[in-house]
């Protein structure tokens, strides 16, 4: 870990000389700040690359031809297609046909699958979601799978397979429009999707027969749709993306065709479906109170109610009240209720207000005030809700921009990105700078997480740092990779680990091990470690099997990092003070026992050895219980013992040398240990 500056008088010159001999500076190989998405060299083999908005409730496909972006309609003439898959006795249905028969076939009609993709079965969010779903979700090797009856047989489908079917439908729509095969696509995901969810989305594309060239964050794609013609001075925009199942906020700057994401936040389990469920629960209570019948376990009745709740919600965006009527709802009883906009807003106000927290977060992360924002861009069908618009506009004291279709903006931006990758004319000058949502790092001695790629770093990026061994003759180091905002590694999410072995025997702190994190444009992480002495290297690519974070985990980490920031800083400072003392004591001991020991008088040699050994013995007994102040006191005491001896050895030049080489001394104590 990085130790603080060491005052001149506190560092013995022998240590400085020793540090000069091994010079192990923490090294950072700064990666590219962003990526110019120029036409790929293999673009001629791609054919037409399509852009797909794979939504929780609806999906949309678009493409670029002759410099123009086109949103494609399905066979029903609709420009958005329900993300529904159904299995009947005779066939598989996808899109409108699947959604239209859900009330008669609830157990074999699958929707909201995006809420499950890339997550583990025992994840809290998965368990919460399946309570609302009429179809069966089971545990398949620790991952969720949907159980349906297909032609009389029970079959299991993973979320990737179901999403693959929806992507396949989008591919089919494009192929029918073009009259030729489509093999490559750009697909969008929520900005707060973690690595596992992104990987799972790419897998879904492969299942659909699509090579996913790029995973793009939804609000970033929407910003492209909004800002394509903005070539004047820098424009700062907030993209507020409230869809059917996910919520994202991104703060971007647009200048001369350069789109830079400055901050992103969100909630991968908040959207229009949640507003629907509140209405459903309300109607269930009303019906039970009137008729004494609980229909919550009746799948067909619940499917009917959900369908009508969604219709009512949509109607209330343009009128003050609506009538919800279902003939023969259950047991021959009709359902008939009036719902006002005021009642709908009252029921969902807590959820509407919850969307403002990530808005505040992106402003805070970007170091900006509300007044610095030039435009608010609304994306996602749920932004049509008047109360949502009102809360957001009141927050910024500014009207939101309504110049783009909230249902189509994301697919539009994805198509532009696809056009860039396939070399379409008119988009050559677009530069897209996206960011990673969470800090990535490794565990070092003392359990501290050392960050290599900070939260909100533009991607793709590559960062490297030199580490060393913690004990003499250490032959193997374990690289433990974590994701999160807490100071201690154990409080963050463990992504994976690997060993680098075969390190030649050497004193602690001598081997140089370069750890490199490479985060690609899709947010996929590769970690490698190289022994600089031997050139031996090991690496791991963090994939969906490694268990990246769920939405709840992300929220918990960020919230806990804020709540416990003071506690984290205290723990970090204590561990750093302890390691500074331990390294100093070992350094003195090694030098006295080494070549420099021959130049010392026997009494001085004995004094230094005794002082160093006393500290090391004290550390063995008090390493966990001592305070930061006690470690610092021990460090000062040891320094005061050592300095007069080294000053005497090197005479008046010691002070000057110490001044000149202050940075070198810090480098010695700055080595993180694995």
Curated annotation (Swiss-Prot):
Q: Where in the cell is it found?
A: Endoplasmic reticulum lumen
Q: Where is this region: Nucleotide-binding (NBD)?
A: 143-297
Q: Which reaction does it catalyse?
A: ATP + H2O = ADP + phosphate + H(+)
* Major subcellular location class: endoplasmic reticulum
Q: Motif Prevents secretion from ER in this chain: where?
A: 671-674
Identify the stretch annotated as signal peptide in this record: 1-34
Q: Name one GO cellular component term.
A: cortical endoplasmic reticulum lumen
Might you name a Gene Ontology BP term for this protein? Answer: karyogamy involved in conjugation with cellular fusion
Report residue spans for region: Disordered.
Answer: 651-674
Listed A to Z, the keywords are: ATP-binding, Chaperone, Endoplasmic reticulum, Hydrolase, Nucleotide-binding, Signal, Stress response
Regulation of its activity: The chaperone activity is regulated by ATP-induced allosteric coupling of the nucleotide-binding (NBD) and substrate-binding (SBD) domains. In the ADP-bound and nucleotide-free (apo) states, the two domains have little interaction. In contrast, in the ATP-bound state the two domains are tightly coupled, which results in drastically accelerated kinetics in both binding and release of polypeptide substrates. J domain-containing co-chaperones stimulate the ATPase activity and are required for efficient substrate recognition.
Report whether Signal shows up as a keyword of the record.
yes
Q: Where does ATP bind?
A: 55-58, 114, 244-246, 310-317, 381-384
| PROSITE patterns listed in its UniProt record | ER_TARGET, HSP70_1, HSP70_2, HSP70_3
Q: Where is the composition biased (Acidic residues)?
A: 657-674
Q: Which domain of life is it from?
A: Eukaryota
Q: Which GO terms describe its molecular function?
A: ATP binding; ATP hydrolysis activity; ATP-dependent protein folding chaperone; heat shock protein binding; protein folding chaperone; protein-transporting ATPase activity; unfolded protein binding
Q: What is its EC number?
A: 3.6.4.10
Query: What does the UniProt function comment say about this protein?
Result: Probably plays a role in facilitating the assembly of multimeric protein complexes inside the ER. Is required for secretory polypeptide translocation. May physically associate with SEC63 protein in the endoplasmic reticulum and this interaction may be regulated by ATP hydrolysis.
Q: Give the similarity note.
A: Belongs to the heat shock protein 70 family.
- Please name the PANTHER family in this protein's record: HEAT SHOCK PROTEIN 70KDA (PTHR19375)
Q: What is this protein called?
A: Endoplasmic reticulum chaperone BiP
Native source organism of the sequence: Eremothecium gossypii (strain ATCC 10895 / CBS 109.51 / FGSC 9923 / NRRL Y-1056)
């Amino acid at each position: 870990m990085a130790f603080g500056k060491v005052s001149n008088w506190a560092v013995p010159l022998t240590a400085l000389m020793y540090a000069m001999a091994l010079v192990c500076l923490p090294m950072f190989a700064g990666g590219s700040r962003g990526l110019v998405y120029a036409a790929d060299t293999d673009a001629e083999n791609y054919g037409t690359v399509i852009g797909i908005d794979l939504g929780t409730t609806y999906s949309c496909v678009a493409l670029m031809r002759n410099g123009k972006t086109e949103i494609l309609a399905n066979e029903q003439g609709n420009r958005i297609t329900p993300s529904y898959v159904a299995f009947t006795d005779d066939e598989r249905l996808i899109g409108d046909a699947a959604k239209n028969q859900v009330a008669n076939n609830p157990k074999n009609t699958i929707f909201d699958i995006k809420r499950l993709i890339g997550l583990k079965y025992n994840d809290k969010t998965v368990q919460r979601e399946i309570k609302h779903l009429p179809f069966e979700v089971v545990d398949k090797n620790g991952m969720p799978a949907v159980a349906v009856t297909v032609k009389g047989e029970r079959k299991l489908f993973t979320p990737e397979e179901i999403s693959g079917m929806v992507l396949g439908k989008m591919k089919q729509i494009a192929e029918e429009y073009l009259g030729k095969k489509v093999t490559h696509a750009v697909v969008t995901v929520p900005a707060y999707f973690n690595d596992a969810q992104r990987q799972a989305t790419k897998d879904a594309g492969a299942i659909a027969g699509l090579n996913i060239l790029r995973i793009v964050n939804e609000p970033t794609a929407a910003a492209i749709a909004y800002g394509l013609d903005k070539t004047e001075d820098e424009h700062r925009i907030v993209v507020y993306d409230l869809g059917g199942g996910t919520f994202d906020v991104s703060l971007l700057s647009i200048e001369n065709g350069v789109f830079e994401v400055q901050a992103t936040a969100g909630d991968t389990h908040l959207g229009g479906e949640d507003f629907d469920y509140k209405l459903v629960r309300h109607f269930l209570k009303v019906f039970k109170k009137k008729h004494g019948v609980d229909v919550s376990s009746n799948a067909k009745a619940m499917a009917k109610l959900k369908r009508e709740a969604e219709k009512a919600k949509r109607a209330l965006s343009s009128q003050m009240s609506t009538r919800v009527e279902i003939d023969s709802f259950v047991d021959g009883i009709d359902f008939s209720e009036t719902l006002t906009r005021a009642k709908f807003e009252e029921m969902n106000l807590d959820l509407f207000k919850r969307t403002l927290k990530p808005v505040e977060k992106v402003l805070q992360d970007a170091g900006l005030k509300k007044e610095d924002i030039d435009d608010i861009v609304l994306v996602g069908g749920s932004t049509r809700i008047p109360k949502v618009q009102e809360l957001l506009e009141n927050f910024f004291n500014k009207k939101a921009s309504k110049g783009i279709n909230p249902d189509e903006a994301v697919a539009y931006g994805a198509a532009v990105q696809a056009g860039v990758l396939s070399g379409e004319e008119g988009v050559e000058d677009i530069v897209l700078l996206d960011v990673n949502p969470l800090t990535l790092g490794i565990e070092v001695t003392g359990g501290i997480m050392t960050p290599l790629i900070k939260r909100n770093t533009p991607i793709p990026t590559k960062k490297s740092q030199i580490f060393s061994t913690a004990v003499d003759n250490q032959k193997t180091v374990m690289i433990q990779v974590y994701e999160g905002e807490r100071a201690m590694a154990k409080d963050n999410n463990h992504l994976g680990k690997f060993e680098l072995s075969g390190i030649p025997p050497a004193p602690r702190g001598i081997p140089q091990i370069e750890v490199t994190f490479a985060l690609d444009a899709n947010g996929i992480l590769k970690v490698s470690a190289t022994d600089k002495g031997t050139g031996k290297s090991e690496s791991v690519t963090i994939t969906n099997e490694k268990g990246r974070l769920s939405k709840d985990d992300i929220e918990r980490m960020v919230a806990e990092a804020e709540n416990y920031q003071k506690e984290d800083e205290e723990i970090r400072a204590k561990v750093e003070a302890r390691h500074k003392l331990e390294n100093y004591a070992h350094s003195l001991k090694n030098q006295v026992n080494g070549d420099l020991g021959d130049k010392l008088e026997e009494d001085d040699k004995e004094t230094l050895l005794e002082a160093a050994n006393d500290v090391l013995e004290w550390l063995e007994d008090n390493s966990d219980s001592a305070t930061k102040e006690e470690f610092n006191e021990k460090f000062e005491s040891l320094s005061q013992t050592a300095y007069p001896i080294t000053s005497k050895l090197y005479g008046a030049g010691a002070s000057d040398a110490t001044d000149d080489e202050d940075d070198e001394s810090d480098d010695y104590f700055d080595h993180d240990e694995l």
